[in-house]
Amino acid sequence: MQPLAACLSQVYEQQPQVRVFDCIALTHSGGGDLLTERMVNEIKGKYPNSEYIAYPDATGIKRGTSAMYSDIDLLIKGGFKVKALKTNPRVIDRVNAVNKALDGNIIIDPKCKGLIEDLEKTCNKEGTREIDKSNKALTHFTDAFGYFIYWEFPTIKPTLGSIKR
C-alpha cells in the first residue's frame, strides 16, 4: 500500500534556511477514504492556527473517474495555499536541488525517521540516473521533500551558447 507522505518544515532567512520538524505518512483505511483530506485534517489538528503551504506532485490536479475533487482541490478546500507545477520536474533536477540544499542548508528533526531513512537509503538503479523504486517503503518522503525544495531552492542550470567571431 502506497502511503501519502508529508514533510513539514519552516523556512528561515538565516542558515540553515530549511528546518524539517515533522513527517507524516498515512495509508488508506479502506472504503471511501479520502487520503488527502485525512492528511489535511491531521496536519491542521497537530499544528492549528498556522499558515499551510503544500507542494504536491503535479498529478494531484487530476480527478479520478469516481472522485468529486482532485487532491489539489482538497488541499485548497482545506485552507492550504498550493504551489504546484503544471508538470513534475525531472527527477534528476529534484535530486540535484535536494543534494545542494543538504549541503548545510537543512536541519531535520531526529524524529523524522522516514525522511532520514529515505535520504540514506534511496539510490539509483545500477548504471542509470533513475531512482530505484523497487523498495515500496522508500522514496515517499524524499519525493514529497523534493517537490518543496525544487520549488523554493531550485538549482540554476548553466546555459551554454556560442560566441560569434
Please provide the spans of the model-predicted regions.
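Gly/Thr-rich phosphate-binding beta-strand-loop-beta motif of the actin/hexokinase/Hsp70
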Residues: 1-12
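Mg2+-dependent endonuclease catalytic cores in nucleic-acid-processing enzymes, primarily RNase H-like
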Residues: 15-132, 155, 163-165
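Active-site-proximal flexible loops/turns
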Residues: 5, 64, 150
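Catalytic-loop motifs flanking and including active-site residues across diverse enzymes
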Residues: 2, 35, 71, 140-144
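Acidic, Mg2+-coordinating catalytic module of metal-dependent nucleases/exonucleases
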Residues: 133-157, 164
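Generic structural signal for hydrophobic core residues of well-folded globular domains
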Residues: 10, 123, 148-152
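Short, conserved catalytic/metal-binding motifs centered on acidic residues
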Residues: 6, 54-56, 144
